[in-house]
């Protein structure tokens, strides 16, 4: 703060409501522009607070006029006197304004608030001493932390007080009503409604000197006493209105922190209990349907983890938990008007894909989005109708979505197949797939692997064998790989005939009941004979066809269409039987000389290397078997 000696400060920020009471909680503003944010380069930096944006806001002063303004540049929003500042817009700062860098309704201990004080105005008020002032010390001494929270230089004194005392202060021993009265009675220079200057202010009540009070009289002149009572009556109504909001608020003053269940069931966007909640895939974070309806128009990222959202689903379990919680805590239920408003803003009436973002929304610094509903900032005119599911075969898909055609020119190169548009598993059905065009608002099904929609032609396949399979025979889950090729990164081919499934090079790792030692024995056996897992699969399928090997489902054979997971599960069943039928003469002596484990293949300790090396687990359980 070397600049303090060179340039006179024009304002001061005093920390409010925070747990820290350090000397650095008071900051003098002397530069023309003062920045606040999480970056270390900011003048007021919060490097460890993820609720603060990299460049949250900035305070500027007009050196000619002396006017001070605040511009919000954050993603979470800046709040002044409980009113959210519109992003990229400036807000004029007045003496006594409370600036919330972080505002959490249900977690006031996380609030980061500062009281702005204009030093020029403070000097003006100190240059006009009261007629009955006892000493100059009373005019020039620094206000206490509670007195600094109030300023009544605006025409309506209730503006700043109502915005400040609705949240708990650092003093938990006195109720809000008492603090309000004390502050109004002790702050010098309180402006009255009739516009009296410092000569008719309440300065007489702020003096603690008995001699000064004796000179003035116990209650001051009758006119002053009448104006004081009017001021107290007006603010008492404000306090009564705020206290009537909840019957149990007074009893909860010592511990404002919500219980764990309430924290779990709270939406981070509106900071209220979840209402008709939805979950995002793949991250599974949960929000109110109405809150996320407004969010998804501005960003395709999750407000919590910044993960790209692929799908939005109703969360019925959490909805039931919220309903049960509200039965036990009816005072925390939303008002009927609030619920109707949220239902009207809800655009997620069914499970759906994340729609295309219509306007950009800054995702700076990866900070957590904590939107506030303190003011009606978002325009209601941005509402759009419920989007319906479309796929690459829907009419007009290419026209509305600027993407390359879904089917590249026929090519036998591997590069064209890696894109997933011409998979080798669907070469028998290229014409029927490529020529199909979805009817208007036709039925679609979502691929379990890539979460992308495709036409639902499963019923049509029962009558037309040229339609590519779209679901697994065992689990009946839909997959798109055989229809037009799955485009998900890392997909080996999520749907294919059992004999053509690509299980990957690591499919033999822990393939025998997660026993790595037994699996390594099998891998060494195959390598010594120049065999691969594919050769073993074909040989095992032939044995299953002859009835030598058994599978849990009689329908499974080499041509059965299976998904990757069902195929891998049945591959492990066949692999165990293949290993069981290897003659002992073809295995090393160190393998065949081990005694059998009592628990056999059902042993839960075989995953430990020492136990797996000591006992053979390619056998059936012989002890404690029911």
UniProtKB/Swiss-Prot annotation:
Record PROSITE patterns: FHA_DOMAIN, ZF_RING_1, ZF_RING_2
Documented EC number(s): 2.3.2.27
A molecular-function term among this protein's GO annotations: nucleotide binding
Keyword Cell cycle among record annotations: yes
Region (Disordered): 123-170, 188-229, 351-387, 402-428
Entry's family note: Belongs to the CHFR family.
Record's protein name: E3 ubiquitin-protein ligase CHFR
Organism per entry: Xenopus tropicalis (Western clawed frog)
Gene (UniProt): chfr
């Amino acid at each position: 703060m070397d600049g303090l000696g060179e340039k006179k400060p024009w304002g001061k920020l005093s920390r409010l409501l925070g747990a820290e009471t350090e000397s650095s909680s008071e900051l003098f503003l002397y530069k023309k522009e003062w920045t606040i944010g999480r970056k270390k380069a900011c003048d007021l930096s919060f490097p460890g607070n993820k609720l603060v944006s990299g460049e949250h806001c900035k305070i500027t002063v007009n050196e000619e006029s002396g006017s001070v303004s605040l511009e919000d540049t954050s993603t979470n929003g800046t709040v002044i006197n409980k009113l959210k500042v519109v992003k990229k817009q400036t807000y004029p700062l007045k003496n006594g304004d409370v600036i919330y860098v972080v505002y959490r309704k249900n977690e006031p201990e996380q609030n980061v608030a500062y009281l702005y004080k204009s030093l020029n105005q403070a000097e003006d008020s100190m240059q006009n001493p009261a007629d009955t002032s006892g000493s100059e010390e009373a005019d020039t001494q620094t206000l206490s932390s509670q007195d600094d929270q109030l300023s009544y230089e605006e025409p309506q004194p209730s503006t700043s007080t109502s915005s400040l005392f609705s949240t708990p202060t650092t003093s938990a021993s006195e109720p809000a009503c008492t603090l309000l009265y004390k502050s109004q009675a002790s702050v010098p220079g309180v402006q009255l409604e009739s516009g009296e200057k410092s000569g008719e202010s309440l300065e007489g009540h702020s003096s603690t000197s008995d001699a000064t009070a004796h000179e003035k009289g116990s209650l001051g002149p009758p006119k002053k006493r009448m104006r004081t009572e009017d001021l107290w009556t007006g603010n008492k109504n404000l306090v009564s209105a705020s206290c009537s909001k909840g019957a149990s608020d007074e009893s909860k003053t010592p511990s404002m922190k919500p219980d764990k269940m309430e924290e779990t069931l709270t939406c981070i966007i509106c900071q209220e209990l979840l209402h008709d909640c939805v979950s995002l895939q793949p991250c599974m974070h949960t929000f109110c349907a109405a809150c996320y309806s407004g969010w998804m128009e501005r960003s395709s990222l999750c407000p919590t983890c910044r993960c790209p959202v692929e799908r939005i689903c109703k969360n019925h379990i959490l909805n039931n938990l919220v309903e049960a919680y509200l039965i036990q805590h009816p005072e925390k239920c939303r008002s009927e008007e609030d619920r109707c408003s949220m239902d009207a803003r809800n655009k997620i009436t069914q499970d759906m894909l994340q729609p295309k973002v219509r306007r950009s929304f800054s995702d700076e610094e990866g900070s957590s989005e904590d939107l506030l509903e303190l003011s009606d900032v978002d325009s209601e005119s941005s509402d759009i109708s419920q989007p319906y599911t479309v796929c690459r075969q829907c009419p007009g898909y290419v026209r509305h979505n600027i993407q390359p055609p879904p089917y590249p020119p026929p090519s036998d190169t591997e590069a064209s197949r890696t894109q997933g548009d011409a998979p080798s598993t669907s070469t028998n059905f290229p014409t029927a797939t490529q020529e199909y065009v979805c009817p208007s608002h036709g039925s679609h099904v979502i691929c379990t692997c890539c979460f992308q929609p495709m036409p639902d032609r499963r019923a049509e396949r029962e009558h037309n064998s040229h339609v590519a399979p779209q679901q697994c025979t065992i689990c009946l889950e839909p997959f798109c790989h055989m229809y037009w090729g799955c485009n998900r990164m890392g997909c080996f081919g999520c749907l294919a005939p059992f004999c053509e499934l690509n299980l990957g090079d690591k499919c033999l790792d822990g393939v025998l009941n997660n026993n790595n030692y037994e699996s390594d024995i099998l891998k060494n056996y195959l390598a010594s004979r120049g065999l691969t897992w594919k050769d073993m699969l074909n040989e095992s399928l032939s044995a299953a066809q002859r009835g030598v090997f058994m599978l849990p489902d009689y329908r499974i054979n080499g041509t059965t269409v299976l998904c990757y997971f069902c195929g891998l599960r049945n591959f492990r069943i066949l692999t165990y039987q293949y290993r069981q039928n290897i003659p002992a003469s073809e295995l090393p002596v160190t393998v065949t000389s081990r005694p059998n484990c009592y628990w056999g293949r059902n042993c839960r300790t075989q995953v430990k290397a020492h136990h797996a090396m000591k006992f053979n687990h390619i056998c059936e359980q012989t002890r404690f078997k029911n």
